[in-house]
Amino acid sequence: MILKLYNTRTKDFSELTNFENVKVYACGPTVYNYAHIGNFRTYIFGDLLIKTLRFLGYKVNYAMNITDIGHLTGDLDDGEDKVAKTAREKGLTVYEISEFFTEAFFNDCRKLNIVYPDKVLVASKHIPIMIEVVKILEEKKITYFSNGNVYFDTSCFKSYGEMAGIDLIDKDMTLPRVDVDKFKRNKTDFVLWFTNSKFKDQEMKWDSPWGFGYPSWHLECAAMNLEYFKDALDIHLGGVDHIGVHHINEIAIAECFLNKKWCDVFVHGEFLIMDYNKMSKSRGNFITVKDLEDQNFSPLDFRYLCLTSHYRNQLKFSLDNLQASKIARENLINKLSYFYESLDPVDLNTLNKDLKNFGFSVEKEYYDSFVEKISFDLNVAQGLALLWEIIKSDNLSFVSKLRLAFIFDEIMSLNLREEILKNLQNHDVVIDENMKALIEERRIAKCEKNFKRADEIRDFFAKKGFVLVDTKEGTKVKRG
């Protein structure tokens, strides 16, 4: 089935009709601190997109950048380099800071079951292409040099700012989050290359035709995209906060460099809201994955919470909401565990084979419904609701419910199969009357020192995947 996504660029839904080599780029973290769960809501949305594309049969080439230089504290053209600022405060080098927080970011991604990109593009390792892009733009007379820095002249790009709202420019207003800079020709111009840093001892600098300096955040993403994906990008991901400045600047750089349209589809995820504000490091109102773990939450409790809301809707975060998601996720695992432990060996064997080998029409109808929901703008929240409908259904067998749950989990990534097995290892198996009779026979055999018969009964259970554990309270049956 063809995936439809809401395209911020066109303000309409776009169909992805090319199933071969879908090029996807996501704005990754600026590695000066731990990523917070507001950041991870966006990365979970990106993860859902990549997994949905692959689930539907698209061949995906997925890249993410790591910003280890040039992202200023103001997110614009003012302020100090965030990584350099943290390095100075902690008495470490910028390389030590960026390496530490990059590793921390991907460790948290693993805990949240966020897919690892096919290519990770570290900004400081791609300086030559950034310089080359600026040189080409300079040759086209799209840049100017002012106060030691190279600016992009937005008046040379007639469609500048369309994705954010062209009316802002028509009214000679400043776009959201853009400050006044007396060295700019136009209010919307932005720096491509800094040689005149406001801060002494800027550690990360490179030689360039304009002097020793460093690239802007906007140049980094555009240039690395052009280097890795060449002249075409299919989908660009990011948070809604990137629309008003960063992504329109990327579009301007790339399309002036290429002399043609660059990326057709931009997809943006909404904020995670806490105390009526977006979660933000600069505001000081942020929570990390480790903070959740310290309060006895699983990172997958947070992932479940994210699955309950569409990516284009703001999601309110509170400990109460997270606790509700924790309870719901545990209830889901408990119900699926009950189904699983009730299966006979034939059904268990079926689950280990082709999951999509559906036995009857009702099962296939639920599967088709799930595919339809995720194919229309990643409506995973409706897919999760459908999973609960399946669990409560009287028209499906236990093996059908489990099969559908495991299929859905290829995208939801709640580790359902693993969590079920872990759950069953920690809980006694519900046994029927025949099993109870055999356990009692084994108890009597052991009392009568008929160890041969006792071992035969033990081996009988073992062949069915059960382990008998003798305790003071009696014999318990557990999954092997």
Swiss-Prot record:
Q: How is the cofactor bound?
A: Binds 1 zinc ion per subunit.
Please name the source species: Borreliella burgdorferi (strain ATCC 35210 / DSM 4680 / CIP 102532 / B31) (Borrelia burgdorferi)
Q: Where in the cell is it found?
A: Cytoplasm
Gene field: cysS
Motif 'HIGH' region: where in chain: 29-39
Positions binding ATP in this chain are 281
Pfam families annotated for this entry? tRNA-synt_1e (PF01406)
**GO annotations under biological process?**
cysteinyl-tRNA aminoacylation
Alphabetical keyword list: Aminoacyl-tRNA synthetase, ATP-binding, Cytoplasm, Ligase, Metal-binding, Nucleotide-binding, Protein biosynthesis, Zinc
Q: How does it assemble?
A: Monomer.
Q: Where is this motif: 'KMSKS' region?
A: 278-282
| Family recorded in the similarity comment | Belongs to the class-I aminoacyl-tRNA synthetase family.
UniProt-recorded name of the protein: Cysteine--tRNA ligase
- Any idea which positions bind Zn(2+)? 27, 221, 246, 250
List the cofactors: Zn(2+)
One example of the protein's molecular function in GO is:
zinc ion binding
EC code = 6.1.1.16
Catalytic activity, as annotated: tRNA(Cys) + L-cysteine + ATP = L-cysteinyl-tRNA(Cys) + AMP + diphosphate
Write out the GO cellular component annotations.
Answer: cytosol
Show the SUPFAM superfamilies listed in the entry: Anticodon-binding domain of a subclass of class I aminoacyl-tRNA synthetases, Nucleotidylyl transferase
